[in-house]
């Protein structure tokens, strides 16, 4: 019985992949390492744990994406205190961002609603003490309009040493 409780109580951990799973970028958003092909692109189906991060959004995050979002990145990566999240859209969409640690503990949860189409870049503050030096985190993003999923994915980020 105790074994069952311990097994069921364990949370899955994020596997960031080989070579830290981070796409390193400089202060000008130029890649300075091998690019992780699973980061900053369209994801397939998310696990139950990943879907739960977006409960209450009113969007089926495992439905078929209805649009395209381009040029998604976060720089610099690793991050010292501030990160710039960038993307380009051809429709007026809302954006939900969730940053989690390797045990899926939510550290940042925010929504943006730019008024129109275009290229966007905005600053995210990572100075909170919950972001530890040298640690890796995962940022999930969902672009949506009403209850329609337009695009979703993730990117792995690291705090500078």
Q: What is each residue range found by the language model?
A:
Residues 41-65:
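A general sequence property marking short-to-moderate contiguous segments
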Residues 115-147:
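Short, surface-exposed loop/turn motifs with a glycine/proline- and acidic-biased composition
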Residues 107-117:
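Solvent-exposed serine/threonine-rich low-complexity stretches and specific carbohydrate-binding patches
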Residues 6-9:
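C-terminal motif of bacterial Sec signal peptides marking the signal peptidase cleavage site
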